[in-house]
């Protein structure tokens, strides 16, 4: 079985994420027969890969996350792990989100949580808001962290004001913050991680928007899926509303997902 990366490109942040995501299906067998089963899986050319726009899950009224540390503009110690603390309002971490979608796609047994994204990297899932959370050692210079609430199946809570950010330095006040709150921003969230069995049959794509709205005649969001290192687009969709989407038909393999924010003229918004 090949173990993939997702190469994720945001129109606001040009970034490369190395997210392990093996797409496998029930019946592949155990370790002894795994190679044979993976070899018999259909190629991407032999199946219909689709991206279907979905509906938002029911709203969690008033849910919001906010950083309480570090402070915006803080200069943190060089050579030490960076700790952030997040508080939440009208949101309960650690419980299952009670919707039919929780049984239909990959769902965390640890329940609801917040997604913390540092410098455009893969999100950290924090299941214990209110306690310091370690995001690791960061190089000296300018950094940005974003947080928003997430349902147990990793769909972001898209309430107005649900997201927060903090810009800070490590070691010295040098460099440019990756996140500019005054610019239109699209933030990649899902998929991430290892997908096997039933969870691999329907995979959610999700993102977060800041300072921008999608519409038929304005900004839009575009997904493109390719095999790792390939040029051919296997599936693509353009969204005019801020909703999750769902991928079906991906065989075993390694895939790259590109997420872009497009202006009304169809050009990628620089950033």
Give the positions of each predicted feature.
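Beta-strand cores of secreted/periplasmic/IMS beta-sandwich domains, seen most often
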Residues: 81-88
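Intrinsically disordered, low-complexity segments enriched in small/polar and acidic residues
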Residues: 37-38
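Short, compositionally biased P/S/T/A/G/V-rich stretches that sit at domain boundaries
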Residues: 45-79, 169-198
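C-terminal motif of bacterial Sec signal peptides marking the signal peptidase cleavage site
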Residues: 24-27
């Amino acid at each position: 079985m090949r173990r993939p990366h997702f190469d994720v490109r945001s129109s606001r942040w040009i970034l490369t994420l190395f997210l392990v995501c093996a797409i496998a299906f029930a019946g592949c067998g155990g370790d002894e027969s795994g190679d044979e089963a993976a070899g018999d899986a259909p190629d991407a050319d032999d199946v219909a890969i689709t991206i279907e726009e979905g509906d938002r899950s029911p709203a969690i009224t008033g849910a919001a996350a906010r950083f309480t540390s570090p402070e915006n503009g803080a200069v943190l110690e060089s050579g030490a792990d960076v700790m952030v603390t997040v508080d939440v309002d009208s949101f309960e971490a650690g419980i299952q989100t009670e919707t039919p979608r929780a049984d239909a796609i990959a769902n965390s047994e640890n329940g609801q949580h917040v997604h913390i994204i540092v410098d455009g990297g893969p999100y950290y899932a924090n299941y214990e808001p209110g306690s310091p959370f370690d995001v690791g050692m960061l190089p000296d210079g300018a950094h940005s962290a974003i947080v928003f609430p997430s349902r147990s199946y990793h769909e972001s809570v898209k309430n107005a004001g649900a997201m927060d950010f903090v810009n800070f330095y490590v070691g010295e006040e040098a460099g440019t913050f990756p996140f500019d709150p005054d610019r239109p921003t699209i933030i990649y969230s899902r998929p991430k991680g290892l997908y096997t069995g039933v969870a691999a049959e329907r995979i959610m794509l999700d993102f977060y928007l800041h300072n921008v709205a999608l519409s038929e005649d304005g900004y839009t969001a575009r997904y493109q899926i390719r095999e790792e290192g390939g040029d051919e687009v296997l599936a693509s969709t353009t969204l005019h509303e801020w909703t999750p989407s769902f991928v079906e038909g991906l065989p075993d393999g390694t895939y790259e997902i590109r997420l872009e924010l497009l202006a009304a003229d169809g050009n990628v918004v620089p950033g």
